[in-house]
């Protein structure tokens, strides 16, 4: 399927990605993004080839005169994976217009888009409005002395129920809930926490993950995985009534020390822009922003 759309000249087209062009596609994707967990072409290519045929068909190439100049992934009312070869930056608006046109033709009303903030001016010019953004932060690992007066131990998989209740309570009223993160039913939460142990967010690293205990009560937890080539802090939370006492810092430093012992030089995490307490903690430990912000934006339905 090829669609000319209502935007731009006939020389620029959106086409479903052909597997034979996957290498060129992901090379273009990497060239236009700085907010990614890795720039390793093979990792991205292997992840794509591991998708189901239906998932692969959601990837589209923006092609000009037969050359791939942009990438995007289209859902029924969603745009993601948006990237433009920097040498074709003037075509960004045309590619986006064609994507919106294609989704509108398919019946989409409101459209949600995910992209790096370098593309935000173009999205905003077409009516997309930022909902929230997240940024990737990284820090070098280092060994530190274990905290005094705080019991840390690796969580066990049979603690999923206890950890689930802990995370539900810790995230109640959190800034991210207004954006649809860290919400859901008890079953959804159990599935999410259990999925971290099972590898849904990368290989779970039990020896770099900890719970902080006061007696039998969990007052803090950090869960670390190995995702896209680097250790990732998948979750870090502290009980509401125990915040400001250094528990989050102790958990993070314990994990970083264990990773250093595993010869992992760096660790990454993602934080929502505006979550200043978390961001300030991470910066004080040595984390710095890497790449641009990953933005989630929304285009309301026509006539709204």
For the regions a language model picked out, list residue spans one by one.
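Conserved hydrophobic beta-strand within the GNAT/NAT acetyltransferase core sheet
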Residues: 110-114, 233, 267-271
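A short beta-loop-alpha structural element at the N-terminal edge
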Residues: 9-27, 151-177
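Conserved acetyl-CoA-binding loop-helix of GNAT-fold acetyltransferases
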Residues: 89-102, 238, 244-261, 280-284
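Conserved active-site alpha-helix within GNAT-family acetyltransferase domains
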Residues: 116-133, 249, 274-291, 299
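Acyl-donor-binding surface of acyltransferase catalytic domains
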Residues: 1-8, 76, 86-156, 296-297
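Conserved donor-binding loop and adjoining core beta-sheet/short helix segment
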Residues: 32-34, 39-103, 214, 222-231
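Helix-loop element at the rim of GNAT/NAT acetyltransferase active sites that forms part
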Residues: 27-42, 166-182, 200-201
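A conserved beta-strand-loop-helix scaffold within acyl/acetyltransferase catalytic domains
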Residues: 47-48, 74-77, 178-230, 236
